[in-house]
Amino acid sequence: MKISKNEEEIYQYMRIHQFHTLFSFHVLPYVELHSFQTKEMICSEGNALPYLYYLISGRAKIYMSHKNGKVSLINFIQAPSFIGELGLIGVENITKSVEVLEDCVCLALPLKDCQQLLLQDATFLQHLCKFIGEKTITRTENYAKNYSYPFENRLAAFILLTEQNNCYIEKHTEASEYLNVSYRHLLYVLNRFCQQNYLRKEGRTYYIQDRNTLEKLADELKI
């Protein structure tokens, strides 16, 4: 992780992404710029997150571990998005892991300096309520799609969502659980995608060969 406190640089990012409009107080003195590379952890499970993050570029995934050793893939984050908002308002006591899929840049607000300002800012809370509501709707729609569309369409969308530099490398156990299919069926369809030249497998990595077809399959899920 790289941290910048350069006010001129931060101001430019704030202006481009209209970050200042989310607050009624002068937020610039508190903001830091945090950059994360692929595979870095924005947040590790169980560790308190000392910042409220606003993701302005990049992608990340959220997952959690269980007492039996299994790991569950929960959701994906794409810009623009808050990270750590549930901890801020006190409804999530144990943080989940957030891992970078594609280099991420975040505007960061240190909670030790401005948590009370945030919780007392009606403008910010209105924006936060809208964000949480939209996120809830998206998760509900994704859950419904898992039971309403053929697996080929859902897998194509999942591959495009998680691919890194044209490579798909997600663990089969996590992917099958997230997509609500058996491990065996996941492997069967991945193999069929390779036979149809949508993908090419080398070792444990799948390389995207026919992005257009995958995009057409994934587009069926769009509402």
At which residue positions do the language-model features occur?
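Cyclic-nucleotide recognition modules
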Residues: 73-130
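A cytosolic small-molecule/anion-sensing beta-strand core signal
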Residues: 37-38, 56-57, 78, 102
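Short beta-strand segments in beta-sandwich/barrel cores
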Residues: 32, 41, 59-64, 82, ...
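Polybasic "coupling" helices that flank or enter modular domains
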Residues: 101, 118-184
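Glycine- and acidic-residue-biased ligand/ion/polar-headgroup-sensing regions
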Residues: 50-62, 79-80
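Short phosphate-coordinating micro-motif centered on Lys-Gly-acidic
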Residues: 42-47
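Phosphate-/nucleic-acid-contacting segments
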Residues: 149, 158-223
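Cyclic nucleotide-binding regulatory module and flanking cytosolic helices
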Residues: 1-38, 83, 87-88
